[in-house]
Amino acid sequence: MGVTKKPDLNDPVLRAKLAKGMGHNYYGEPAWPNDLLYIFPVVILGTIACNVGLAVLEPSMVGEPADPFATPLEILPEWYFFPVFQILRTVPNKLLGVLLMVSVPAGLLTVPFLENVNKFQNPFRRPVATTVFLIGTAVALWLGIGATLPIDKSLTLGLF
């Protein structure tokens, strides 16, 4: 089952465009052989050359050896877990923290169903979904930045 928008052939504007040949892909240059034989290998080899050059010129240091008997002062998760880590760190009740963690994917699952009756794909014509996305992004950035700060400055980011 695919979700594709079918064109409304009764629309006079669309019929006028199709009559002029604007609805078909007759413009531009073909992907074969121009892109696939000449441009893509140059881009791939250039990317490999940049990676090898960076690896040779700026090798990453191994760092200090691990000491199993010394625990670091603060253990931080990977960067993509910072917002959820901040939720767990600031909420005093463990059950509430776990429920808030579960609400993150549950909230993400509801976003496509907001304004799903709207036929427009332009985000400016879907104000509710766009607002939910922008507020969610701002909250995730706020929590992610706050997770890197000490607990007393984490919610205000040291600004207030």
From Swiss-Prot:
Keyword Nucleotide-binding: no
Compartment(s): Plastid, Chloroplast thylakoid membrane
InterPro entries: Cyt_b/b6_C, Cyt_b/b6_C_sf, Cyt_b6/f_cplx_suIV, Cytochrome_b_C_euk/bac
Any Pfam family matching the protein: Cytochrom_B_C
Topology within the bilayer: Multi-pass membrane protein
Transmembrane feature ranges: 36-56, 95-115, 131-151
CC per GO annotation: chloroplast thylakoid membrane
Keywords from the UniProt entry: Chloroplast, Electron transport, Membrane, Photosynthesis, Plastid, Thylakoid, Transmembrane, Transmembrane helix, Transport
A GO molecular function held by the record: electron transporter, transferring electrons within the cyclic electron transport pathway of photosynthesis activity
PROSITE patterns listed in its UniProt record: CYTB_CTER
Subunit composition and interactions: The 4 large subunits of the cytochrome b6-f complex are cytochrome b6, subunit IV (17 kDa polypeptide, petD), cytochrome f and the Rieske protein, while the 4 small subunits are petG, petL, petM and petN. The complex functions as a dimer.
Family to which this protein belongs: Belongs to the cytochrome b family. PetD subfamily.
Function noted in UniProt: Component of the cytochrome b6-f complex, which mediates electron transfer between photosystem II (PSII) and photosystem I (PSI), cyclic electron flow around PSI, and state transitions.
Protein name: Cytochrome b6-f complex subunit 4
Organism expressing this protein natively: Coffea arabica (Arabian coffee)
Upper classification of the organism: Eukaryota, Viridiplantae, Streptophyta, Embryophyta, Tracheophyta
Primary gene name: petD
